[in-house]
Swiss-Prot record:
Record's note on what induces expression: Not induced by high-light treatment.
Disruption phenotype: Lower maximum photochemical efficiency of photosystem II after high-light treatment.
Subcellular location: Plastid, Chloroplast thylakoid membrane
Binding positions for Zn(2+) 1 per the UniProt entry: C87, C90, C132, C135
Name used for this protein in its record: Protein disulfide-isomerase LQY1, chloroplastic
Stretches that traverse the bilayer: 51-71
GO cellular component assignments: chloroplast; chloroplast stroma; chloroplast thylakoid; chloroplast thylakoid membrane; mitochondrion
KW Chloroplast (keyword) present: yes
Length: 154
């Protein structure tokens, strides 16, 4: 007995629904199609993965817009407040002790044989202190975004 080949499976798509059949009663003057013509109707079904993907996309866009707006409002509010916090490195004085002469203004060099030479500090020009690099001498702690580039005084 000969074995027949199986027929190919009928293609099925979840997006194509049963075709619409037009009957003479559904035919009206505004519908110009012939009654025997039928077209497939497309329907969309959302599976849970698609719903999750769309939700994540919408949430990402909302956060992408919301976070910068939040930061801008915080910056604006901080700019309106008065800043009276004393500078931390200089304790509000606006000057820091020179690290080379340790605030004395003089540098002592031992030449040997018991001889010493005392000269003015070349870092602070004998003043013993330098302008604070954090507050630029104002004595007020700058806000984070107002800080200048750090200048190393060594």
């Amino acid at each position: 007995m000969p074995v027949s080949a199986p027929s190919p499976p009928r293609l099925h798509s979840p997006f194509i629904h049963c075709p619409i059949n037009f009957t003479p009663s559904s035919f009206s003057a505004r519908n110009l199609r012939s009654p025997s013509t039928s077209y497939p109707r497309i329907k969309a079904e959302l599976d849970p993965n698609t719903v999750v993907a769309i939700s994540v996309g919408v949430a990402s866009v909302a956060l992408g817009i919301g976070i910068p707006v939040f930061y801008e409002t915080q910056i604006d509010n901080a700019a309106k407040r008065e800043n009276t916090q004393p500078c931390f490195p200089c304790n509000g004085t606006g000057a820091q002790k020179c690290r080379l002469c340790v605030g004395s203004g003089n540098v002592t060099v031992e030449l040997g044989g018991g001889e010493k030479e005392v000269s003015n500090c070349i870092n602070c020009d004998g003043a013993g202190s330098l302008t604070c690099t954090t507050c630029q001498g104002s004595g007020v702690q700058p806000r984070y975004l107002d800080r200048r580039e750090f200048k190393d005084d060594d």
